[in-house]
């Protein structure tokens, strides 16, 4: 447009996106609220399993996690729709101001139309929640999980002995207090030990390999590590039982 500068950041011709981009940034911050809600629901669900509270209460937390995961998907789709619209308009540089709201809504609905339950497998916190819930039930020896895993009637001492192997850090060779799981290979380590190992290797410009014997994963990164809340609780419960038996 004559007399208009298009060199300013966040604008295309006479169309300014600064306000939209600012609002988009604030919208992204809402992601932290969703993550916090998922962490709380996950923690409560694990508490319910640990205390063997009625299944209906646990189901409520599971339902809450589904709702959070759904909200997370909607937020990601909306952010993607806005960003896609902005990029498209910047590239096209139209003389006439388009209906941005309508364009965003069309892109958002197009993304939403492809929704499926399989999408939840891409939500890291939701997947982690389901895995830890299953693991904690197994560690607590709940009947339903024994039947599902085909371990009904198996000696509990054998199960405990097998579980204790998972309690030991492959680096320190000691029982873990703050276990973290590697998302890539699934092995667990003491948090401080594996972080020190990764940092030490990085200082020498080398990759950190998984210290678990037999594991072929040779590039562990801090971003691959997640808190293994189920294992931490299982270790604590095991120690409490051991302490009671020794009294």
From Swiss-Prot:
Enzyme class: transferase
UniProt GO cellular component terms: chromosome, telomeric region; nuclear body; nucleoplasm; nucleus; PML body; Smc5-Smc6 complex
GO BP: cell division; cellular senescence; chromatin looping; double-strand break repair via homologous recombination; positive regulation of maintenance of mitotic sister chromatid cohesion; positive regulation of mitotic metaphase/anaphase transition; protein sumoylation; regulation of telomere maintenance
Enzyme Commission numbers on file: 2.3.2.-
Post-translational changes noted in the entry: Sumoylated, possibly via autosumoylation.
An annotated Gene Ontology molecular function: SUMO ligase activity
Entry keywords, A to Z: Acetylation, Cell cycle, Cell division, Chromosome, DNA damage, DNA recombination, DNA repair, Dwarfism, Intellectual disability, Isopeptide bond, Metal-binding, Mitosis, Nucleus, Phosphoprotein, Telomere, Transferase, Ubl conjugation, Ubl conjugation pathway, Zinc, Zinc-finger
Pathway annotation from the record: Protein modification; protein sumoylation
Binding site for Zn(2+): 185, 187, 210, 215
Subcellular location, record wording: Nucleus; Chromosome, Telomere; Nucleus, PML body
CDD domains with a match to the protein in the record: SPL-RING_NSE2
Chain positions of cross-link Glycyl lysine isopeptide (Lys-Gly) (interchain with G-Cter in SUMO2): 90, 107, 125, 130
Positions of modified residues (Phosphoserine): 116
Modified residues (N-acetylmethionine): 1
SP-RING-type Zn finger ranges: 154-240
Annotated effect of mutating residue 27 to F: In a breast cancer sample; somatic mutation
Predominant location category: nucleus
Disease: Seckel syndrome 10: A form of Seckel syndrome, a rare autosomal recessive disorder characterized by proportionate dwarfism of prenatal onset associated with low birth weight, growth retardation, severe microcephaly with a bird-headed like appearance, and intellectual disability.
Family: Belongs to the NSE2 family.
Complex formation: Component of the SMC5-SMC6 complex which consists at least of SMC5, SMC6, NSMCE2, NSMCE1, NSMCE4A or EID3 and NSMCE3.
Function, as annotated: E3 SUMO-protein ligase component of the SMC5-SMC6 complex, a complex involved in DNA double-strand break repair by homologous recombination. Is not be required for the stability of the complex. The complex may promote sister chromatid homologous recombination by recruiting the SMC1-SMC3 cohesin complex to double-strand breaks.
Protein's name according to its UniProt entry: E3 SUMO-protein ligase NSE2
Organism: Homo sapiens (Human)
């Amino acid at each position: 447009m004559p007399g208009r500068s298009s060199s300013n950041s966040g604008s295309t011709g006479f169309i300014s996106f600064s306000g939209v981009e600012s609002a988009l940034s604030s919208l992204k911050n809402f992601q932290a609220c969703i993550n916090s809600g998922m962490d709380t629901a996950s923690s409560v669900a694990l508490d319910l399993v640990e205390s063997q509270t009625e299944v209906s209460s646990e189901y409520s937390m599971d339902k809450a996690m589904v709702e959070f995961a759904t909200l997370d998907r909607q937020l990601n789709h909306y952010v993607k729709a806005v960003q896609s619209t902005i990029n498209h308009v910047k590239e096209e540089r139209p003389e006439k101001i388009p209906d941005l709201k309508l364009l965003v809504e069309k892109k958002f609905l197009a993304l939403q139309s492809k929704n499926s339950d399989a999408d939840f497998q891409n939500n890291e916190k939701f997947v982690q929640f389901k895995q830890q819930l299953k693991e904690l039930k197994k560690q607590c020896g709940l009947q339903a999980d024994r039947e599902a895993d085909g371990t009904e009637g198996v000696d509990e001492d054998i199960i405990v002995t097998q579980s204790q192997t998972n309690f030991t850090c492959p680096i320190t060779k000691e029982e873990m207090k703050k276990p973290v799981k590697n998302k890539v290979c699934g092995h667990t380590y003491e948090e401080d030990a594996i972080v020190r190992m990764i940092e030490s290797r990085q200082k020498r410009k080398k990759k950190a390999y998984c210290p678990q014997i037999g594991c072929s994963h040779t590039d562990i990164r801090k971003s691959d590590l997640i808190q293994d809340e189920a294992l931490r609780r299982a270790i604590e419960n095991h120690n409490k039982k051991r302490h009671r038996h020794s009294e």
